[in-house]
């Protein structure tokens, strides 16, 4: 069993976080979840619930631990806590800017800072469009320091029909980077 941190910031795309946490837990991994106040609002607006756990099948709850964003004293704040990867999905441009400047003023930003300084996998899923030059500079700075930047761009050649299809595709890309085996991972096969 591996241990993953999933941070959820206030950008649109709550379904991506729900899908990722559900699949990691279904695969038997421990998932530490940190939700920003803005993400709580987005969760309510997009999925009509105030409880993140209410969006996850109850049989998976045993593998999920929710942390308060203000719990800077959490063991997750320390590089001595072993974590296999940190994923922030969706990741707002405000969170990207803070991480790129090394701001660790809450648990969500701190775990990203720890991942960078400890040279552990950090996957950021920025959900913003269009991107300004400032956004691009921040993303470049993070990529140059080891972060994987994974914009939630659907793989159109798989012909998604629903929002769930798109979420599954994007989460499959995250899981592939983590080198996990999941039915959500799709591989291109030339039909001709």
Curated annotation (Swiss-Prot):
Dimethylallyl phosphate binds at residues 157, 173. It catalyses: dimethylallyl phosphate + FMNH2 = prenylated FMNH2 + phosphate. PANTHER family: FLAVIN PRENYLTRANSFERASE, FLAVIN PRENYLTRANSFERASE PAD1, MITOCHONDRIAL. The gene is ubiX. Belongs to the UbiX/PAD1 family. Flavin prenyltransferase that catalyzes the synthesis of the prenylated FMN cofactor (prenyl-FMN) for 4-hydroxy-3-polyprenylbenzoic acid decarboxylase UbiD. The prenyltransferase is metal-independent and links a dimethylallyl moiety from dimethylallyl monophosphate (DMAP) to the flavin N5 and C6 atoms of FMN. It comes from the Bacteria. Keywords: Flavoprotein, FMN, Prenyltransferase, Transferase. Its EC number is 2.5.1.129. It is an enzyme of class 2 (transferase). FMN binds at residues 10-12, 36, 92-95, 127. One of its GO terms (molecular function) is flavin prenyltransferase activity. It comes from Chlamydia muridarum (strain MoPn / Nigg). This is Flavin prenyltransferase UbiX. InterPro entries: Flavin_trans-like, Flavoprotein, UbiX-like.
């Amino acid at each position: 069993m591996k241990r993953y941190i999933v941070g959820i910031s206030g950008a649109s795309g709550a379904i991506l976080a729900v899908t990722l946490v559900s699949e990691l837990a279904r695969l038997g991994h421990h998932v530490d979840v940190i939700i920003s106040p803005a993400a709580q609002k987005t969760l309510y607006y997009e999925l009509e619930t105030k409880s993140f756990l209410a969006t996850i099948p109850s049989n998976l709850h045993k593998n999920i631990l929710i942390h308060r964003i203000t719990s800077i004293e959490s063991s997750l704040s320390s590089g001595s806590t072993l974590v296999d990867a940190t994923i922030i999905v969706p990741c707002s441009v405000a969170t990207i800017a803070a991480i790129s400047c090394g701001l660790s003023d809450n648990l969500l930003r701190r775990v990203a800072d720890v991942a960078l300084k400890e040279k552990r996998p950090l996957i950021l899923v920025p959900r913003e469009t269009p991107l300004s030059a400032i956004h691009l500079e921040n993303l470049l700075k993070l990529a140059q320091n080891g972060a994987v930047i994974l914009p939630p761009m659907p793989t159109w050649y798989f012909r998604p029909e629903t929002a769930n299809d798109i979420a599954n595709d994007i989460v499959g890309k995250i899981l592939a980077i983590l080198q996990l085996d999941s039915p959500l991972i799709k591989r291109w096969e030339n039909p001709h």
